[in-house]
């Protein structure tokens, strides 16, 4: 019998309450979640001092007490830029997940076009519109205004920037 493993991927620059809500809903639906923190050299997180390594470490800290969540990092530096790299990116992500033949990835996304791209490639993807009216872009641009939305493990990074 197959077991579904939820997959939530993103830049998480920074992780915020909308991401946490999506991860929690994925966990409730599937039981286990793999959170994939992705990025590349000089990406939008890197430009504010929040590179892939830091985001991965903060995400690990966020879920360190949760045995149902596994955090992985996906370095996209050598991949073609979105949207051209979908197939290579997906292949690398699936290799990273290292699922058994009885485990089936089910993607949870907050971008409708991501769900469409995954469906085209034969994967289950649940689109869940953004909640809380927040985005990582808003937080990067106005961290003090949106500090209450930042995931706890990422808060100190922004406090140090003040």
Each language-model region and where it sits:
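Nucleotidyltransferase catalytic core that binds NTPs
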Residues: 1-162
